[in-house]
């Protein structure tokens, strides 16, 4: 009995021992981390009540370019039902071979900005809708079981007419 209680005590100590966090282990995409590591992940981009919402039946594509030493990722989200295409032009430091995770604010092509001149909606009749303000949040699992990066992209834009354009896309981006 004495040996059994010692064995159980050792088993309890080993079972309760904290695991060592491996910084090389990728964090799967999620919409929040409860303030544990990357605070930007806790920021919510509200897509509710949008006049135009890119969510279901969307095909996502990306073109990877380089501009002034920055990664210039040009994303298109095509709505198969309406024929609308949302273009996102994101700039980030050249770190990964996929779209850099983070929050992109409206800007002019500096690091971690969504370029205000090249983020817009293209309508089937070839007209464009430009935005006056916006934000994009990108979460990525670069080691998804499919073998390709898996993205969760949320975005919210406003145009001159105060219409809200939003995106909540989950899936892979086909490289062009």
List PLM regions with ranges.
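Sec-dependent bacterial lipoprotein signal peptides
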Residues: 1-14
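Bacterial Sec-dependent N-terminal signal peptides
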Residues: 13-48
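Primarily marks secretory-pathway-exposed extracellular/lumenal segments that are disulfide-
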Residues: 20-28, 106, 140-142, 174-175
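N-terminal helix-cap/turn-to-beta initiation motif at the start of protein domains
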Residues: 27-33, 136-150
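Edge beta-strand at a domain terminus
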Residues: 35, 39-40, 152-176
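Surface-exposed helix/loop patches within compact recognition domains
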Residues: 52-145
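Residues at beta-strand starts and edge strands
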Residues: 84, 134, 147-151, 163-167
